[in-house]
From Swiss-Prot:
Record's subunit section: Homodimer.
Ranges for region Disordered: 1-38
GO biological process terms on file: calcium ion transmembrane transport; calcium ion transport; calcium-mediated signaling; photosystem II oxygen evolving complex assembly
Disruption phenotype: Defects in photosynthesis and reduced growth rate. Pale yellow leaves with reduced PSII activity. Altered Ca(2+) and Mn(2+) partitioning in chloroplasts and reduced Mn(2+) binding to PSII.
Keywords (A to Z) from UniProt: Chloroplast, Membrane, Plastid, Thylakoid, Transit peptide, Transmembrane, Transmembrane helix
Membrane topology label: Multi-pass membrane protein
Upper classification of the organism: Eukaryota, Viridiplantae, Streptophyta, Embryophyta, Tracheophyta
Organism annotation: Arabidopsis thaliana
GO CC annotations on file: chloroplast membrane; chloroplast thylakoid; chloroplast thylakoid membrane
Protein name: Protein PAM71, chloroplastic
């Protein structure tokens, strides 16, 4: 009987105690459903030691559940960060696509205008050409092309005009900013080689086109009232006047043209990665720079201005002057293109370039008249 009363007295009625605070209490404002099930769903043994083991298991389960919830929230945050990063990358790609499409469309419009002008000029020249004279002159085309560099003209004047025109056309141009930005991220020597190589090839192509137009005019001259008119010189004057007026209008109207050119150059350069060392990295930088500058320069103002100068001036003088102008502008870009803007205004450079276009057009007109 005494043992029965002792055993009955040891049966203390159980009251669910408050679980101790855990390290994960700050991550949740209320106990989770799994922790409530862990505390109240199962009958609690009477013995204190057994009860302590039970609470230890509950706390272990509680920590496990809270860890899973915390990890899930971290996973959600990582997903959100990845989503934002992906969205920013897609937005950058869309901006780059729009930039490339607009640049291609602008170059295409310029090329279409010039080709339309050349087509009209060629049609007028053919209409004013004597058929018998044209037929007799066609066999001399090969001989004219072979001796194409025999008529060199005044090399000094061609050099001076090409140097001044190209130098002031390239300062502040997109090609200038591309060279400056690439030189800030890569070796200045490799960037100069790639940029100058692309501009040199472009200059040779422009001079060949200009001289071809010049010798076609010699084979099929334009006759007006018994007088032969130099249609190549007239076309050169029209091109120079067109680019001179357009440059001056851009200088007057476009306040943020330099910023726009710089942003386009930054987007173009952001797609190139020339990091590394050694011969392979230098070759990759040269090839990437060459391709980027060649595409950016094709159909540009300096491209057609070189064609116009080559059609009316000495080809060797134009090549030497254009290469010297491109080399000087590229050297300034790779050595300190960002510092140049502190001393020269983009609008002032545009005014000088536009005036030079008009001056050379006037000089060509004077040569035609005399």
């Amino acid at each position: 009987m005494l043992s029965l009363n002792l055993s009955e007295s040891l049966r203390i009625p159980f009251q669910n105690p408050r679980p101790p605070k855990s390290d994960f209490s700050s991550t949740s404002s209320s106990p989770s459903s799994s922790s409530r099930r862990c505390v109240s769903a199962y009958p609690i043994p009477i013995g204190f030691s057994v009860r302590n083991q039970y609470f230890s298991r509950c706390l272990t389960q509680l920590r496990r559940n809270e860890s899973q919830q915390l990890g899930f929230r971290c996973f959600q945050r990582n997903d959100a960060a990845c989503y934002l990063e992906k969205a920013e990358s897609e937005e950058h790609d869309r901006n780059l696509d729009v930039l490339v499409e607009s640049s291609i469309a602008h170059s295409r419009r310029e090329i279409q205008r010039v080709l339309m002008f050349l087509a009209v000029s060629g049609s007028v020249a053919l209409l004013g050409t004597d058929p018998a004279f044209a037929a007799s002159s066609i066999p001399n085309v090969t001989q004219s092309l072979v001796t194409s560099f025999g008529d060199l003209g005044d090399i000094s004047s061609g050099f001076a005009s090409a140097f001044l025109l190209i130098f002031f056309s390239e300062l502040g141009d997109k090609t200038f900013f591309i060279a400056a930005l690439l030189a800030a991220r890569n070796s200045a020597a490799t960037v100069f080689v790639g940029t100058f190589g692309a501009l040199g090839i472009m200059t040779i192509i422009s001079v060949v086109l200009g001289r071809t137009f010049h010798y076609v005019d010699e084979v099929l001259p334009f006759r007006f009232g018994g007088t032969d008119l130099p249609i190549d010189d007239i076309a050169a004057v029209c091109l120079l006047v067109y680019f001179g007026v357009s440059t001056l209008l851009d200088a007057v109207s476009d306040e943020g043209k330099a910023d726009e050119e710089q942003k386009e150059a930054e987007l173009a350069v952001s797609e190139l990665s020339g990091n590394g060392a050694g011969i392979v990295a230098a070759a990759n930088t040269i090839i990437s720079t060459f391709a980027l500058v060649f595409v950016a320069e094709w159909g540009d103002k300096s491209f057609f201005s070189t064609i116009a100068l080559a059609a009316a001036s000495s080809p060797l003088g134009v090549i030497a002057g254009a290469l010297a102008g491109h080399g000087a502008a590229t050297l300034l870009a790779v050595l300190g293109g960002s510092l140049l803007g502190n001393f020269l205004s983009e609008k002032a450079i545009a005014y000088v370039g536009g005036v030079l276009f008009l001056v050379f057009a006037a000089v060509t007109v004077a040569e035609i008249v005399t």
